[in-house]
A protein has these predicted regions:
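Conserved AMP-binding/adenylate-forming core of the ANL superfamily
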Residues: 41, 45, 54, 62-107, ...
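Conserved AMP-binding A3 loop
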Residues: 74-76, 203-227
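Conserved AMP-binding/adenylation subdomain of ANL enzymes
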Residues: 226-243, 251-291, 305
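Conserved ATP/PPi-binding loop(s) of AMP-dependent carboxylate-activating enzymes
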Residues: 374-377, 388-413
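A short helix-loop-beta submotif of the ANL/AMP-binding
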Residues: 99, 105-125, 129-133, 142-147, ...
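Conserved structural elements of the adenylate-forming
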Residues: 79-84, 217-239, 300-304
Length: 413
């Protein structure tokens, strides 16, 4: 493409992004001092979790950012707690480029560890909470993180795997004590002063499914712009300062992606450590969530509840149920929308490329189970074994290009 063509394409994309972000309420009129704080945070931190919570703390200090089984946290509380945790990590010898493994379920500790890493420029490594001892050992040996943040329930597994790392407990029951430092103690008494941005932003390493052996690590840097988020919001009607129930695991690429979207929207994020179908409906209804983020098997388990239970909870506020992580059966999409309205979105993607296509409720009604179409900024091509494009209606290998693509594998089989 010629230089004038490239310029025209860039201008068009940025104009579309601006329009979408304004429509979603991410860009909105605000007090001059808060506008300045937002601009400074974006310039200093870039589009990172550290920037998002710094901005949200400035714009919505007293609004609730996280709801979990431990209670609620406002955006200002999250900002101060993650500052304290980042300082504690630094005091423990963790710095820019160092790895911090995170083995946590869905709760504030997972989020606080990720944001603290972002503030330091450290790299977050997400460990599957269903790992066996051999998988855990192999991944930790290969990735060589400097520290580990974990839930107390995994202490025995870590001890069996002989994990020799600086360890921090993110979630514990009152009667449990492994002797490791608790994050809750650090954030309650630590240094809450703002940190200086690192020279290079940290990365997130999300593990693949590991169907052929030890899960591979897929390194993912933060996107360089808001274009991918705007492209997603073009298809899924979410707006700023709404409430999202994230049932999908945060360590999974889909759960993490939607949390990233949520903090860009300054959403209130509702979490439950372990998935329970009825509890998910209850929390979604109780908090009047406008979005419920799931993987398809969660929809299946919800729909297996008896009719009386399904009718007990009012999901009238929900306008988007984004599902991803595996194939969505056609019968499942039809039954869900027949019960709860046309609010189901099916996203096809992978750990390596994030989302490739998005199916709207209209798409799913027309062709149940469809993967939909590529969002703006994503290119999907099918090629045969010789590297030639296949004709429409033919089968081929899928290639995806977008700003969310990963940088490469860290190893594994």
């Amino acid at each position: 493409m010629s230089l004038p063509g490239q310029i025209a394409t860039t201008v068009k994309t940025k104009s579309q992004t601006l329009a979408t972000l304004t429509r979603a309420g991410i860009i909105r009129p605000s007090r001059p001092d808060r506008v300045l704080q937002t601009a400074v945070a974006l310039v200093r931190w870039g589009p990172t979790p550290a920037a998002a919570y710094t901005i949200n703390a400035a714009r919505y200090p007293d609004e609730v950012g996280i709801v979990d089984e431990a209670g609620t946290l406002t955006f200002l509380e999250i900002q101060r707690r993650t500052n304290a945790l980042a300082h504690a990590f630094a005091d423990a010898g963790i710095g820019p480029g160092d790895g911090v493994a995170i083995m946590c379920r869905n709760h504030r500790g997972f989020i606080e560890a990720v944001v603290a890493c972002s503030k330091l420029g450290a790299n977050a490594l997400f460990l599957n909470t269903a790992f066996s001892k051999p998988q855990l050992t192999d991944v930790l040996e290969r990735e060589a993180p400097k520290a580990l943040v974990y839930d107390q329930e995994f202490a025995n597994l870590l001890d069996e795997a002989d994990v020799d790392l600086v360890r921090f407990i993110a979630w514990h029951e009152p009667e449990e004590d492994s002797g490791d430092t608790r994050i809750e103690d650090l954030v309650g008494t630590g240094n809450i002063q703002n940190l200086s941005p690192p020279k290079e932003p940290g990365k997130a390493t999300i593990l693949t499914s590991g169907t052929t052996g030890t899960p591979k690590g897929a390194n993912r840097s933060q996107p360089k712009s808001m274009d991918p988020i705007a492209a997603l919001l073009d298809r899924i009607p979410l707006k700023a300062r709404e409430t999202t129930m994230i049932a999908a695991p945060l360590f999974h690429s889909w759960g993490y992606a939607h949390w990233s979207l949520g903090i860009s929207l300054a959403s209130t994020v509702v979490l439950k450590r372990k998935f329970d179908p009825e509890a998910t409906l209850s929390l979604t209804a109780q908090h009047q969530a406008t979005a419920l983020v799931v993987v398809p098997v969660m929809l299946q388990r919800i729909l297996e509840l008896d009719d009386e239970t399904l009718k007990r909870y009012d999901l009238g506020a929900v306008k988007a149920v984004p599902a991803s992580g595996s194939a969505l059966p056609a019968s499942l999409s039809d039954r869900w929308m027949d019960l709860f309205g046309d609010n189901l979105f099916n996203l096809y993607g992978s750990t390596e490329v994030a989302w490739a296509t998005i199916a709207t409720p209209e798409d799913l009604r027309a062709a149940p189970g469809t993967a939909g179409k590529p969002p703006r900024g994503t290119v999907v091509k099918l090629y045969d074994d010789d590297g030639k494009p296949v004709a429409q209606g033919e089968t081929g290998r899928i290639f995806v290009g977008n700003e969310m693509a990963f940088e490469g594998y860290t190893g594994g089989g």
